[in-house]
């Protein structure tokens, strides 16, 4: 009788032990499922940025904005390779001499019929280049997300867009307009530091951060009509700002779950 009771006790004890062990294993597996390896992802980006000019660029323009598209490949080791194209737009001018010789004291332009014209001056341009960088995940729950450092290099161009809606001023037509638009271009390098987030459900994928762009540019017009001279000086065009990107990811395959 004593042995039977002892056997029954040991049986119950072993049963509870097995159940507890199974529960522990299930908990470990459930936990491991949450830990994912990094994926290879193709990214199609919609990019928006606000930039503040510095150095030579600040003498010509005020705050500007960028909107563009990009494509990037994120490897399983979280390295990034890509390319982008961005439009530049702005409406604040600081080039005081522009149209000075055909303006009234009130800042308007008079056409041949003696009518006052409010000629619009805007910043227009674009940036295109190649990108390389890396994501540094620090939360094991999502190996695709984390702080990001991205370098870019390529070509930039901008000019002053002179808008004469009625096309009624001869000095602002065709070849004459080129003497005022300050067409400028050259090479640039850009650094971006921010945070990249890829959602587990793949629906919300964004990045945001700060960018610093340095352009090695030069005016490309042979003659500036408002200054009555040429301008061959090398320029340092700097843009410092904030960038936000919306990412449409295409995964090579479904995210793998790693069991330990």
Place the predicted regions along the sequence by residue:
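Cleavable N-terminal export/targeting peptides
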Residues: 1-37, 251-260
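Short glycine/proline- and aromatic-enriched beta-strand/turn motifs that initiate or cap beta-hairpins
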Residues: 21-76, 80, 84, 245, ...
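Short loop/turn motifs that connect adjacent beta-strands in outer-membrane beta-barrel proteins
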Residues: 31-41, 77-78, 138-146, 198-206, ...
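Extracellular/periplasm-exposed beta-strand and loop segments of Gram-negative cell-envelope proteins
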Residues: 33-35, 55-60, 91-125, 158-186, ...
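Residues that define the transmembrane beta-barrel architecture of outer-membrane proteins
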Residues: 40, 63-67, 122-128, 145, ...
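Residues on the lipid-exposed face of transmembrane beta-strands in outer-membrane beta-barrel proteins
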Residues: 46, 50, 69-73, 85, ...
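Internal, conserved structured core segments that host functional sites
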Residues: 82, 122-161
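Predominantly the C-terminal beta-signal and adjacent terminal strand-loop region
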Residues: 191, 197-260
């Amino acid at each position: 009788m004593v042995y039977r009771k002892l056997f029954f006790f040991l049986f119950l004890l072993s049963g509870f032990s097995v159940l507890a062990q199974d529960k522990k294993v299930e908990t470990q597996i459930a936990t491991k499922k949450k830990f994912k390896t990094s994926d290879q992802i193709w990214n199609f980006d919609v990019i928006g940025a606000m930039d503040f000019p510095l150095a030579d660029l600040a003498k010509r323009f005020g705050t500007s904005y960028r909107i563009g598209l990009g494509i990037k490949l994120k490897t399983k080791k979280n390295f990034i390779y890509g390319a982008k194209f961005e439009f530049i737009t702005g409406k604040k001018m600081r080039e005081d001499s522009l149209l000075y010789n055909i303006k009234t004291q009130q800042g308007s332009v008079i056409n041949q019929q003696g009518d006052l014209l409010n000629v619009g001056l805007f910043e227009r341009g674009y940036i295109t280049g190649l990108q390389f960088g890396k994501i540094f995940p620090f939360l094991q729950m999502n190996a695709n997300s984390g702080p990001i450092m991205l370098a870019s290099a390529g070509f930039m161009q901008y000019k002053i867009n002179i808008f004469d809606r009625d096309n009624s001023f001869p000095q602002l037509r065709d070849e004459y307009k080129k003497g005022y638009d300050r067409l400028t271009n050259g090479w640039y390098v850009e650094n971006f530091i921010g945070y990249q987030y890829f959602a587990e459900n793949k629906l919300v994928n964004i990045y945001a951060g700060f960018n610093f762009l340095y352009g090695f540019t030069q005016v490309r017009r042979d003659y500036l009509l408002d200054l009555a001279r040429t301008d061959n000086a090398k320029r340092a065009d700097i843009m410092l700002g904030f960038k936000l990107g919306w990412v449409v990811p295409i995964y090579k395959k479904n995210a793998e779950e790693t069991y330990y």
